Amino acid sequence: MSTSNRILLGVNIDHVATLRQARGTRYPDPVKAALDAEEAGADGITVHLREDRRHIQERDVLLLKDVLQTRMNFEMGVTEEMMAFAERIRPAHICLVPETRQELTTEGGLDVAGQEARIKAAVERLSKIGSEVSLFIDADERQIEASRRVGAPAIELHTGRYADATTPTEVADELQRIIDGVNCGLNEGLIVNAGHGLHYHNVEAVAAIKGINELNIGHALVAHALFVGFKGAVAEMKALILAAAKA
């Protein structure tokens, strides 16, 4: 667990695959995007293999497992299909996320407190393959404490409410919620990551929170890459979060 100013950047490449799937082509290649991201300073690559396969495909994950120089953070729903696939590929990191077919993107955190037995069984099973398991949850004390009880070594705090806040008061309130969540997670002995909806204009305040280990960012990078290229987009984000963490 890192409580220093060293903060990691996990690059989510799902939306490179979204662009590919929109036309059913072989391009753009998310694997190339991952390699470019690593070259530009990414500390890890995040992919979410959804039940509906709307972006990332099994083939992408298998190729990434073979070629990544950093590490894969494999996001997945708590289903038997995904559990079996994770056991097959044995990623370095696994993040359990909620998932519904209708959502545009992951809309909220996993309800760990409401299904502790199920999540504990999943954490135990996935830990046996050597993966570090994290839980994508809201910055809520009840969920954080439940995450510790089920045996997860790490959590990823959902920053979507902060990203969606529109007034200065809302932004301040949601940022404080994240700060409190980070402190609660650290007090519970957990590694604390964060992500969802972060972009170039809101990431610095989150990156400045002491105790956050890693930020996972995707859509904003892919969007900015249209104008500056993927390596440039990743390098700019990495510079932003490192500068904010040192401030």
Swiss-Prot record:
A Pfam short name: PdxJ
One Gene Ontology molecular-function label: pyridoxine 5'-phosphate synthase activity
Chain residues that bind 3-amino-2-oxopropyl phosphate: 12, 23, 197, 218-219
Residue numbers annotated as active site: 48 (proton acceptor), 75 (proton acceptor), 196 (proton donor)
Entry EC no(s): 2.6.99.2
InterPro entries: Aldolase_TIM, PyrdxlP_synth_PdxJ, Pyridoxine-5'_phos_synth
Top-level taxon of origin: Bacteria
Site note Transition state stabilizer, residues: 156
A cellular component term, taken from the record's GO annotations: cytosol
Enzymatic reactions: 3-amino-2-oxopropyl phosphate + 1-deoxy-D-xylulose 5-phosphate = pyridoxine 5'-phosphate + phosphate + 2 H2O + H(+)
Cytoplasm as UniProt keyword: yes
Pathway annotation: Cofactor biosynthesis; pyridoxine 5'-phosphate biosynthesis; pyridoxine 5'-phosphate from D-erythrose 4-phosphate: step 5/5
Family annotation (Gene3D superfamilies): Aldolase class I
Subunit structure: Homooctamer; tetramer of dimers.
Function description: Catalyzes the complicated ring closure reaction between the two acyclic compounds 1-deoxy-D-xylulose-5-phosphate (DXP) and 3-amino-2-oxopropyl phosphate (1-amino-acetone-3-phosphate or AAP) to form pyridoxine 5'-phosphate (PNP) and inorganic phosphate.
Name of the protein described by the UniProt record: Pyridoxine 5'-phosphate synthase
Organism, scientific name: Pseudomonas fluorescens (strain SBW25)
Lineage: Bacteria, Pseudomonadati, Pseudomonadota, Gammaproteobacteria, Pseudomonadales
